[in-house]
Design a protein with these regions (language model features):
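Hydrophobic, ordered structural segments
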Residues: 107-122, 126-134, 209-257, 325-369, ...
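A short beta-turn/strand-edge loop motif at beta-sheet boundaries
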Residues: 175-182, 291-297, 413-419
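Short, surface-exposed beta-strand/strand-loop-strand elements in extracellular ectodomains
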Residues: 183-189, 298-305, 419-428
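Short, structured motif recognition centered on aromatic/hydrophobic residues
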Residues: 169, 187, 230-234, 284-288, ...
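Hydrophobic, well-ordered beta-alpha structural blocks that scaffold small-molecule cofactor pockets
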Residues: 2-153
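Intrinsically disordered, low-complexity Pro/Gly/Ser/Thr-rich segments with frequent PxxP/GP/PP motifs
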Residues: 190, 194-227, 306-338, 432-463
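Carbohydrate-binding surfaces of carbohydrate-active enzymes
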Residues: 170, 182-183
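Conserved functional hotspot residues at active sites or interaction interfaces
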Residues: 7-10, 24, 127-174, 239-292, ...
């Protein structure tokens, strides 16, 4: 039940890496507003033909059904003959029959494509395109190239204002640093059921300046009741960067809620990972924000223990642009920390938030991460270790031990990561390595927590400065394989209050003159 859309392509042989925009163009809230009238015209056709020269029709069909209405599908490229499209065999465009009363050219800015086939269109056949779904020109940064990524600098944020639960989004105008003049944000707030609560535009400050969107101020401005839903953000008239980056603060009225996470990934993924199972005194809630104008079918969002095939589906359909809180412990009641949960998202939503709610009343927010499906183990990493020093380093801070507990948990972040051959290094603030622990060839379903307190106590050690950092690195002494996509979750808890924070990072090769694989 995954959406058959392409959202992001990583670097690879013969492809242009980066985010894809067709799904964003079709799924933009303004496109969704215009779609019913456009789609009704298609449905009224006696015999609809679809001309699909660019291969867009099946993506359109994911959002606005075409297959049930199309009497014929035509293509431009002869190579596409014999490749089913919209459930039927396509024909060349020069075989367009005379009995079609409506021809859909599945493209934006299709004037050139229409002119190329004008002599083939029977008299009396109406021609329509995707242009009725297009955004107004004032929202485009590159009007001459509608699907240019810069035209769809968009993102979603979890946004709520309820008793004890407030949110604040903080971002910056980095677009003007690239030369953008008068950029602004186009914003739409959806409630939990996906209904629009407010739509507005907001000018951005001068180059490098910060912008804040506070749920209390939005609530007051639009005279809203309590809400918990999605804020859709579209940066317009921009240059240089097609992603809306932000920090998301959650805070309460009494100090029990205070946490921060960063932006959602703007491209919905098939899988996410790094969702921790709850401790006995915790509840872990996964926030799912439907990022498209079509429902998520019941059972399409699935959770499973990391490394296990058996999954459990969320048995409720989620309406377009709606938000749902999924209790991970209710779906997987036998799973507990340090076990991890994999999310089969089906490309239905952007990188999700999760909240940890503790028995002491404290709660914190963090995010899962995109789990790559294209990555495979790279034998060169093991072969080149003599040239790489520590190689890929996954660092996490160790906060002052007198005040905080620091815990690390390796997190598989690629579907092909069957194992992680790892060791942990503990380093004092002065740069001195205090301890090393070989963790072994860890299977993806059995990754241990690394509790700094327990490690120091077990080995009778201390951090002379009282704080420092921890590093996870590959260690191939017992064999194993690696892909360079090493991630970990860091968990920090204040001893005095019990308040905590989760964060996650990925590894890099730091400060090296040589490179490997890029």
């Amino acid at each position: 039940m995954a959406l058959q859309i392409e959202t992001f392509v990583n670097p690879g042989q013969g492809v242009t890496p980066g985010g894809r925009t067709l799904f964003k163009a079709l799924g933009h809230p303004l496109a969704a507003d215009a779609a019913p009238a456009w789609h009704a015209r298609l449905a009224r056709a006696q015999r609809l033909a679809v001309y699909d020269p660019l291969g867009y029709a099946e993506v359109v069909d994911q959002f606005y059904p075409l297959a049930a209405h199309a009497a014929a599908v035509h293509v431009q490229r002869l190579e596409d003959l014999g490749r089913p499209r919209l459930g039927q065999e396509p024909r060349p465009i020069d075989a367009l029959a005379a009995d079609h009363d409506l021809l859909l050219i599945a493209a934006f800015q299709a004037d050139r494509l229409a002119a190329q086939i004008a002599h083939l269109v029977p008299a009396g056949t109406e021609v329509v395109t995707l242009d009725p779904l297009a955004l107004p020109a004032e929202l485009l940064s590159a009007p001459r190239d509608y699907l240019a990524p810069i035209n769809f600098a968009t993102n979603f944020a979890l946004f709520r204002d309820e008793p004890g639960q407030r949110t604040r989004i903080v971002g910056a105008n980095y677009w003007s640093l690239y030369g953008a003049a008068a950029p602004r944000l186009w914003l739409r707030l959806f409630d939990a059921e996906g209904a629009p609560l407010a739509t507005w535009a907001q000018d951005l400050p001068p180059a490098g300046g910060s912008i804040t969107l506070d749920s209390r101020e939005v609530r007051k401005r639009f005279k809203l009741d309590d809400f918990c839903g999605s804020l859709f953000m579209h940066a317009v008239r921009v240059k240089g960067h097609e992603v809306v980056k932000y920090a998301l603060d959650t805070y309460g009225d009494d100090g029990t809620t205070l946490s921060c996470s960063h932006d959602a990934n703007a491209w919905p993924a098939q899988y996410y990972a790094g969702l921790p199972a709850p401790r006995p005194n915790e509840r872990v809630v996964l926030w799912v924000q439907n990022s498209h104008p079509v429902p998520i079918p019941a059972g399409a969002v699935r959770l499973n223990e990391m490394g296990r095939d058996e999954s459990v589906g969320f048995d409720e359909a989620i309406p377009p642009f709606a938000t749902r809180a999924i209790d991970a412990g209710a779906l997987l009641p036998d799973l507990a920390w340090p076990a991890q949960i994999e999310i089969d998202a089906g490309k239905h939503f952007v990188r999700p938030r999760y909240e940890v709610m503790r028995g002491n009343g404290r709660q914190r927010i963090a995010h899962a991460n995109v789990e790559r499906t294209d990555l495979r183990p790279d034998p060169r990493i093991r072969e080149m270790m003599p040239h790489l020093g520590k190689g890929y380093i996954m660092p996490l801070p160790v906060l002052p031990l007198a005040d905080f507990a620091s815990i690390a948990l390796p997190t598989p972040m690629a579907r092909a990561q069957a194992e992680l051959p790892l060791k942990a290094l503990l380093i004092d603030a002065d740069g001195q390595q205090v301890a090393e622990c070989f963790l072994g060839r860890l299977p993806r379903y059995a990754l241990p927590e690394i509790d700094v307190d327990a490690w120091l106590e077990r080995d009778g050690l201390s951090l002379p400065s009282g704080y420092g950092h921890l590093e996870l690195v590959y260690d191939f002494r017992d064999g194993g394989e690696a892909d360079g996509w090493l991630h970990a979750l860091g968990r920090y808890e204040q001893r005095r209050t019990g308040h905590g924070a989760d964060t996650s990072f990925g590894s890099h090769m730091f400060n090296m003159a040589v490179t490997l694989g890029g």
